[in-house]
């Protein structure tokens, strides 16, 4: 087995949909093609939105599809915990390292205030933070704390971050202009996605991150955190998103594309084969097992643009 370690990192806020399945299939195929393994991590940072029953169902769905993981989830393993809701002490340690570098500051801005400020937005829809609370004095911070609990952000430099994406190719983002100072922790104490995934991927030995293209803009921020924390960054490959036939992005609200409904109509091999077809891994939508796709898998065959599902394919 090679040293490649990929991962499934779903957020169990509902049943999987086709987009989640496609990402999982590509992550699994990429790791297995290299003779590597797959870790399953449950990204349930917001535990109220992610009841354990969805995580259990998610494991059953992945197993049914033939996307068997080697470590993590309810199976456990040497790099637990594998549920982010159980990892607060681990994140706290990394957060303290960043705070000790003088890079963390409290932010009292509300979401509505940020959107009302007409600040530019990142490609994933977030506001590029204008630095409103970046240079508050200790007195100003103390006064604001009387009225509102702050979230916490990390300072970023005016610096370009360059990397070569395994699917999308060369990519550059400026941390200050394209991202802005970003959240590490919410006002309610929950740690932010950017910090949690960096800490978890590093401690689980993940060497390859495969995820949707909607997270491409997160990569520069995460590479910055890897550097600050002295951790080795993985390779990244961002796969094109699946769109409904009318061009809408798929979501867990699209019940017709959820695995619950798909399982009632198709076999696992039919679902895998049709996904392999739209992602350029085979010339026709014939039924396939995941194992049968390993040998010929190549990122060169995967499209670079978002994929509109053909009518009546599912």
Can you say where each PLM-predicted feature lies in the sequence?
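Non-catalytic terminal extensions that flank enzyme cores
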Residues: 1-15, 38, 65, 142-143, ...
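N-terminal Rossmann-like or analogous alpha/beta NTP/dinucleotide-binding catalytic cores
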Residues: 1-118, 122, 213-214, 218-231, ...
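Short, mixed-charge aromatic SLiMs
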Residues: 46-56, 244-246, 295-303
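Alpha-helix initiation and N-capping motif
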Residues: 55, 88, 111-114, 126, ...
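Short, surface-exposed acidic
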Residues: 70-73, 233-236, 282-288
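Short secondary-structure transition/capping segments
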Residues: 82-97, 121-127, 148-158, 278-293
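Alpha-helix boundary recognition
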Residues: 96-100, 202, 263, 276
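Active-site cores that bind ATP or allylic diphosphates and position pyrophosphate for catalysis
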Residues: 112-251, 258-262, 311-314
